[in-house]
UniProtKB/Swiss-Prot annotation:
Protein name as catalogued: Small ribosomal subunit protein uS12
Keyword presence, Transcription: no
A Pfam family the protein falls into: Ribosom_S12_S23
Matches recorded under HAMAP family: Ribosomal_uS12_B
GO terms for cellular component: small ribosomal subunit
GO biological process assignments: translation
Homology family: Belongs to the universal ribosomal protein uS12 family.
Gene field: rpsL
Native species: Synechococcus sp. (strain JA-2-3B'a(2-13)) (Cyanobacteria bacterium Yellowstone B-Prime)
Molecular function, one GO term: rRNA binding
């Protein structure tokens, strides 16, 4: 415990907060160009082929970003928008690609949670494409 004289001489330093998404540089989103689109496997105990992309951002960083949703149209040189948000079972993936903006198309036939996947509202007159339950 410091004395009052020591505190007068040198005040307490506040611990600096470390950001979880440094490549965004305090912006909510960033634009970037895909340099590589590939699949990778998650940590134990999960098993899948997760779709990810290596993205070179306008901030100068090159990061790995997750492509959410079923199916995508991204390839090398696609221009995408990324946001923060890690994927718990993919080490090193700290960003998500925003679907439905720039070159990343929205998820097809998405009925619920559409805003998170850039899907347009389905027309009310259309018959349901994949009716789950039938009585």
């Amino acid at each position: 415990m410091p004395t009052i004289q020591q505190l007068i001489r040198e005040e307490r330093s506040v611990a600096a907060r470390k950001t979880k998404s440094p490549a965004l540089k305090a912006c909510p989103q960033r634009r970037g160009v895909c340099t590589r689109v590939y699949t990778t496997t998650p940590k134990k105990p999960n098993s899948a082929l997760r779709k990810v992309a290596r993205v070179r951002l306008t901030s100068g960083f090159e990061v790995t970003a997750y492509i959410p949703g079923i199916g995508h149209n991204l390839q090398e040189h696609s221009v995408v928008m990324i946001r923060g948000g890690r994927v718990k079972d993919l080490p090193g993936v700290r960003y998500h690609i925003i679907r439905g903006t720039l070159d990343a198309a929205g998820v097809k036939d998405r009925k619920q949670g559409r805003s998170k996947y850039g899907a347009k509202r389905p027309k009310p007159g259309q018959a349901p494409a994949a009716a789950g339950k039938k009585k």
